[in-house]
């Protein structure tokens, strides 16, 4: 463990994109002892804030200098910006650099990025290892002002399995995120990731959005809500740009999960129409047992 910790401490790290997640990564990296953390962002004010908060050593708008120095790069860009970022920086990555991302969809992103990574290897001969990852943590608000590394504590982290990745690099990433506070690290294929995320993340956001938007506003709803409504709708305060991309990028899986959810809702609706108390109780008992397994 001492060797791993020493290695992590001496890494030069760059965060690409200092929004709410990128800045939280930077903050967490400093907290676990990484000495040199750079930040890349298109917004000068964001870079200035990051430097003032001492979560990065230096901020950059231009990418070449920090990428050429970095052993470890975390890209926190929106999905539609990933491909162009790699095309524009194909020659800038350091030899033996480890790169990871935080994007919530994988099959599409990997399909975009892997050909570019292969081009880097062929053109430059550089040995670069891209390990696709997904921290299962976030906040409803956006921007560096709302970044907080505490969001990672006891959260789950998914690493995408790929035979091209070096085992020692996979172990290093896994160790880093555990030090950051992530409780469980899972290894999935891209397909497995997108299927389960369609259910546990994207469907839940779709339900929250639909619940809030289904309000007829006949009454002043805010005067009559309780914890159940607050808990169910917390994630309805949503980043429309990011989540529109995530939904569309995983459309097939999400549509399947919506249909599955609709079937369950129809069972409850039919039970009500048929005065079927037994079916209602069965569904309530089933959900209680399943939820208790999560706790």
Which residue stretches match the model-derived regions?
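Interdomain hinge/lid region at the active-site interface
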Residues: 218-287
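Rossmann-like NAD(P)-binding element
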Residues: 64-93, 97-100
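Internal alpha-helical scaffold of NAD(P)-dependent oxidoreductase catalytic cores
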Residues: 151-234
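Hydrophobic Val/Ile/Leu positions in short beta-strands of Rossmann-like dinucleotide-binding domains
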Residues: 13-15, 75, 159
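NAD(P)+-binding Rossmann beta1-loop-alpha1 motif at the extreme N-terminus of oxidoreductases
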Residues: 2-68
């Amino acid at each position: 463990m001492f060797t791993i910790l020493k290695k992590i401490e001496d890494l030069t790290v760059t965060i690409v994109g200092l929004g709410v997640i990128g800045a939280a990564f930077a903050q967490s990296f400093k907290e676990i002892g990484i000495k040199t953390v750079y930040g890349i962002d298109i917004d000068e004010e964001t870079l200035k804030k990051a430097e003032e908060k001492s979560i990065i050593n230096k901020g950059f708008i231009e990418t070449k200098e920090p990428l050429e120095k970095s052993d470890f790069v975390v890209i926190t860009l929106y999905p539609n910006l990933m491909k162009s970022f790699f095309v524009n920086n194909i020659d800038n990555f350091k030899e033996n650099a480890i790169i990871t991302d935080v994007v919530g969809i994988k099959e599409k992103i990997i399909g975009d990025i892997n050909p570019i990574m292969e081009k880097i290897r062929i053109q430059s001969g550089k040995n670069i290892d891209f390990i696709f990852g997904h921290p299962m943590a976030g906040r409803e608000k956006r921007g560096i002002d709302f970044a907080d590394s505490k969001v990672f504590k006891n959260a789950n982290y998914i690493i995408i399995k790929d035979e091209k990745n070096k085992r020692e690099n996979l172990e290093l990433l896994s160790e880093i995120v555990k030090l950051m506070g992530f409780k469980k690290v899972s290894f999935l294929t891209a397909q497995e990731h997108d299927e389960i995320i369609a259910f546990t993340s994207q469907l839940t956001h779709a339900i929250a959005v639909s619940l809030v938007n289904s309000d007829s506003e006949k009454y002043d709803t805010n005067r009559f809500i309780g914890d159940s409504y607050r808990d169910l709708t917390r994630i309805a305060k949503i980043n429309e740009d990011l989540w529109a991309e995530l939904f569309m990028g995983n459309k097939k899986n999400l549509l399947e999960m919506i249909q599955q959810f609709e079937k369950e809702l129809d069972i409850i609706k039919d039970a009500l129409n048929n005065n079927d108390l037994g079916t209602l109780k069965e569904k309530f008992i089933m959900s209680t047992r399943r939820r208790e397994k999560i706790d």
